[in-house]
Design a protein with these regions (language model features):
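S-adenosyl-L-methionine
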Residues: 1-94, 185-209
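Glycine-rich adenosyl-binding loop in Rossmann-like folds that engage adenosine-containing cofactors
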Residues: 4-36, 94, 99-140
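Adenylate-forming
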Residues: 41, 45, 108-111, 158
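Active-site segment flanking the S-adenosylmethionine/decSAM binding pocket
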Residues: 49-62, 127-128, 132-184
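Hydrophobic packing residues within well-ordered alpha-helices of enzyme cores
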Residues: 66, 86, 112, 157-161
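Short "lid" loop at the C-terminus of a central beta-strand within the Rossmann-like core
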Residues: 79-80, 102-105, 152, 177-179
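A generic structural signal for secondary-structure junctions
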Residues: 91, 115-117, 162, 166
């Protein structure tokens, strides 16, 4: 498996199913309507976040678009190929830190599937070599915004972050139906967020802020 640099400078997996489209059009994050609306909201409200945590960073496209509105961003990406792209894409930014691991509702090690032709990486609940941690175990107490894009593993991330979420102001989460792999529906996740006191600010499928 290999990675390549697009004409606009972004490093991406050369095996990705959408690579031809990105070669022609550039940054893939521009396809994200919810993100674009949130960026407009941040600009309009002159919003600046002290600390943002990006869970499931992929190659860093979301982080690159948000870094202008954040003093610090911590990125978590367990897939080694995607992490290699991430490290190259954000390496010049002093306010961005990267971690090659997964987040969930357990502390230990898990196995990942290898879906190199997509942006998807599945976490298998069995022993492996990829580190996984609860967000609550990492000592955060001042996160302003969390973005979660973990291909169905959202509820596990949320359950492992119950204490941390008490002080979080905003969550952007992708709900594309893959959560049923792990026993949770989109409705379950929405109800869980509602029970924690969160209200919808922006909703453009498949993402919610």
């Amino acid at each position: 498996m290999s990675i390549e640099q697009l004409s606009d400078g972004l490093w991406v997996p050369s095996t990705d199913a959408q690579i031809e489209q990105w070669r022609e059009k550039g940054y893939p994050y521009m396809q994200d309507n919810c993100l674009n609306k949130f960026l407009e909201w941040c600009k309009e409200h002159e919003q600046k976040f002290d600390l943002v945590v990006d869970v499931g960073t992929w190659c860093g496209t979301w982080t690159l678009s948000m870094q202008q509105y954040a003093k610090n961003i911590h990125c978590y990406e367990p897939n080694n190929l995607h992490y290699g792209c991430l490290a190259r894409n954000v390496g010049s930014y002093e306010n961005i830190e990267t971690y090659n691991q997964a987040l969930g509702n357990d502390d230990g090690f898990v196995k990942l599937t290898d879906e190199s032709a997509t942006q998807n990486t599945r976490v298998l609940i069995e022993k492996g070599q990829t580190k996984i941690s609860k967000l609550d175990s990492l000592g955060y107490n001042n996160i302003d915004l969390i973005k979660i894009d973990v291909e169905g593993f959202e509820m596990e991330v949320l359950k492992g972050a119950e204490k941390t979420l008490e002080n979080v102001q905003y969550i952007m989460i992708e709900l594309n139906g893959n959560s049923e792999r792990y026993g949770s529906s989109k409705r379950d996740i929405k109800e869980h967020l509602k029970s924690l006191g969160f209200k919808v600010l922006i909703k453009t499928w498949p993402d919610i802020v």
